[in-house]
Amino acid sequence: MEAPLQTEMVELVPNGKHSEGLLPVITPMAGNQRVEDPARSCMEGKSFLQKSPSKEPHFTDFEGKTSFGMSVFNLSNAIMGSGILGLAYAMANTGIILFLFLLTAVALLSSYSIHLLLKSSGVVGIRAYEQLGYRAFGTPGKLAAALAITLQNIGAMSSYLYIIKSELPLVIQTFLNLEEKTSDWYMNGNYLVILVSVTIILPLALMRQLGYLGYSSGFSLSCMVFFLIAVIYKKFHVPCPLPPNFNNTTGNFSHVEIVKEKVQLQVEPEASAFCTPSYFTLNSQTAYTIPIMAFAFVCHPEVLPIYTELKDPSKKKMQHISNLSIAVMYIMYFLAALFGYLTFYNGVESELLHTYSKVDPFDVLILCVRVAVLTAVTLTVPIVLFPVRRAIQQMLFPNQEFSWLRHVLIAVGLLTCINLLVIFAPNILGIFGVIGATSAPFLIFIFPAIFYFRIMPTEKEPARSTPKILALCFAMLGFLLMTMSLSFIIIDWASGTSRHGGNH
């Protein structure tokens, strides 16, 4: 019996300006293809059905207005995470050459993964991650994608707020030139994280379109560029190895120089051994850093929303945006890891900023870097919140039109829950380590590959074609990384130690 024919609109866009062809293409509908009612598509502006003048305006019916540059800022900011603080630690446990190889491999794989997403979305006319899941596997696929996005991004937002909770009191303490932490409310991280969430994060999260956050994204990236410049600068001003009593100095730079001179006379033999970079390292923690590297370029839930809001969108243009964003973050990641590692070598801690406190807790430059990092992670939270809100819309309100009340309530509810987790959960990093180890491989490797395999018509690419075989291998790689990550975390818990080097 012949399969029914389905008319699909190729590359539909909300502003109708796409130039890659809008003619209907008649393709046989395979048994695994599904069409969801347009009314059930994403209510946060992430699908791209054409505007119909005969119907009541739908809030997906807006023109993409985000420029190429703003889109690069938004996607780069989505890629950048708190993991950049742990990459020097990862390099210390892999060596420079192995680190560079892993970082390059992950960057290329992330670009390939985005290519699969864009190609799948172009075939079926969908620009929502969850809707691709529906098209490939029906409601279970849609819910699985929405759940993975929700877990991954809640974990990411929690790690950002955790940084605010731990770092902001130290910044205030340094500004006030206090030797010890006081019991005042403005030195309490719990109060501070709530204050930042209400006054900065929530207003940005209430914006209706991601494009407007391009300005805050640009500022956030500027903060991380400043962090990188400071790391490079400090490489040439921090002695190696660090004197044993360096963490007792409190801003007396003449004393620091005297100690530096004395120690250099005493530890010349040890310095040559300790202060020599390793190019290839394999130890008990090397494998533990691989998941950190693998998840350094997580941005896939944000790719399709940014694609939707792009001015004059096309697959080629969005792929260029993705490649440029990945390339920028690749360079920043490598330089931050390299100069952070070459500053402290094997003495680097899992969070790079903590290591600098050994040199001088009241260093003005490091204080400014802390402020820059806090600013960057604060401005990243609203961008990460957008796909979570969209996923919740997909799961709970699939047939509802846009409502400002629901838009606000979901944002407030999410921030409230995340603040409660950050404040009351003592082992939050371990909890979200598991979440990241399970959801990230699905979002980066497994879902894009299997969605592509199911959605791409067999008439265009047979099941045994090279692209589909590569996609299946890509999915298998994701399962392998997920198994490795979970195994390392379980071993970590069983041994009662913590060796986390960072988190996206």
Swiss-Prot record:
One of its GO terms (biological process) is histidine transport. Keywords: Amino-acid transport, Antiport, Cell membrane, Disease variant, Disulfide bond, Epilepsy, Glycoprotein, Intellectual disability, Ion transport, Membrane, Sodium, Sodium transport, Symport, Transmembrane, Transmembrane helix, Transport. One of its GO terms (cellular component) is plasma membrane. It is found in: Cell membrane; Basolateral cell membrane. The keyword Nucleus does not apply. GO terms for molecular function: amino acid transmembrane transporter activity; L-alanine transmembrane transporter activity; L-asparagine transmembrane transporter activity; L-asparagine, sodium:proton antiporter activity; L-glutamine transmembrane transporter activity; L-glutamine, sodium:proton antiporter activity; L-histidine transmembrane transporter activity; L-histidine, sodium:proton antiporter activity. The chain crosses the membrane at residues 83-103, 106-126, 144-164, 187-207, 213-233, 324-344, 366-386, 408-428, 431-451, 471-491. The record marks N77 as: Modulates L-glutamine-induced conductances and Na(+) binding. It is a multi-pass membrane protein. It catalyses: L-glutamine(out) + Na(+)(out) + H(+)(in) = L-glutamine(in) + Na(+)(in) + H(+)(out); L-asparagine(out) + Na(+)(out) + H(+)(in) = L-asparagine(in) + Na(+)(in) + H(+)(out); L-histidine(out) + Na(+)(out) + H(+)(in) = L-histidine(in) + Na(+)(in) + H(+)(out). The keyword Glycoprotein applies. It holds the Pfam family Aa_trans. Disulfide bonds join C240-C275. Glycans are attached at N74, N247, N248, N252, N323. Symporter that cotransports specific neutral amino acids and sodium ions, coupled to an H(+) antiporter activity. Mainly participates in the glutamate-GABA-glutamine cycle in brain where it transports L-glutamine from astrocytes in the intercellular space for the replenishment of both neurotransmitters glutamate and gamma-aminobutyric acid (GABA) in neurons and also functions as the major influx transporter in ganglion cells mediating the uptake of glutamine. The transport activity is specific for L-glutamine, L-histidine and L-asparagine. Belongs to the amino acid/polyamine transporter 2 family. PANTHER family: AMINO ACID TRANSPORTER, SODIUM-COUPLED NEUTRAL AMINO ACID TRANSPORTER 3. It is linked to Developmental and epileptic encephalopathy 102: A form of epileptic encephalopathy, a heterogeneous group of early-onset epilepsies characterized by refractory seizures, neurodevelopmental impairment, and poor prognosis. Development is normal prior to seizure onset, after which cognitive and motor delays become apparent. DEE102 is an autosomal recessive form characterized by onset of variable types of seizures in infancy. This is Sodium-coupled neutral amino acid transporter 3. The lineage of its organism: Eukaryota, Metazoa, Chordata, Craniata, Vertebrata. The gene is SLC38A3.
